[in-house]
Regions:
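Conserved double-stranded beta-helix
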Residues: 1-51
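Feature marks short, surface-exposed loop/turn motifs that line or immediately flank catalytic pockets
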Residues: 9, 43, 58, 126-128
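Conserved hydrophobic/aromatic beta-strand scaffold that supports enzyme active sites
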Residues: 4, 34-38, 87-89, 97-99, ...
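Double-stranded beta-helix
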Residues: 42-105
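A short beta-loop-beta micro-motif enriched in histidine and acidic residues
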Residues: 21-32, 85-86, 92, 115-116
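Non-heme Fe(II)/2-oxoglutarate
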Residues: 62-65, 97-99, 103-154
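Anionic group-transfer/hydrolysis microenvironments
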Residues: 4, 21, 55, 103, ...
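Glycine-rich, charged/polar anion/phosphate-binding loops
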Residues: 20-23, 36-37, 84-86, 104-107
Length: 154
């Protein structure tokens, strides 16, 4: 569905605030999975990922929608701050694959080191799930969303 190259440059690579990927790529039923490939070592100094183990069981907290051309971040029920006392860093060497459940809260800090921290991410959804029409990320008619079934293009 979506891929990104993330270039967290030395000294200027900014913080990515706590979020759940399902907020931005919602399906019915929820099915987004993130694959985060470490193209370089990721550690505390250069802004590694942090996660909140088990929080994905609590459901999706927010939804980013496109309505009449306007983007909106909406709360899904009562939204309390994440309990950050349970956060853990994911320090990983180059070449590591981190798999993220779509409801797992995660973030990364500023790169305070003299080294870059580059990563490649790929977000996938289930072919049996419905990609919602008001998700912020939509493809135009010249580039429709395509699914794979049994490894073959549909």
């Amino acid at each position: 569905l979506q891929s990104m190259l993330i270039f967290k440059q030395p000294g200027i690579g900014g913080e990515v605030t706590w979020h759940q990927d399902g907020t931005f790529l919602l399906t019915e039923p929820q099915s987004v999975t993130g694959f985060w490939f470490a193209l370089e070592d990721a550690d505390l100094d250069n802004g590694c990922l942090w996660v909140l183990p088990g929080e994905h069981h609590k459901g999706l907290r927010q939804r980013f929608r496109r309505i009449d051309g306007t983007l909106r971040l909406e709360d899904l029920g009562a939204v309390e701050p994440f309990d950050l006392r349970r956060k853990i860093p994911l320090e990983v060497p180059q070449g590591t694959l981190v798999v993220l459940h779509g409801r797992l809260p995660h973030y990364s800090e500023v790169n305070r080191s003299a080294r870059s921290r580059h990563a490649y991410t790929l977000h996938t959804i289930s072919a049996s799930a419905t990609y919602l029409a008001d998700n912020w990320l939509q493809r135009g008619p010249d580039m429709p969303l395509r699914y794979l079934s049994s490894g073959e293009p549909v």
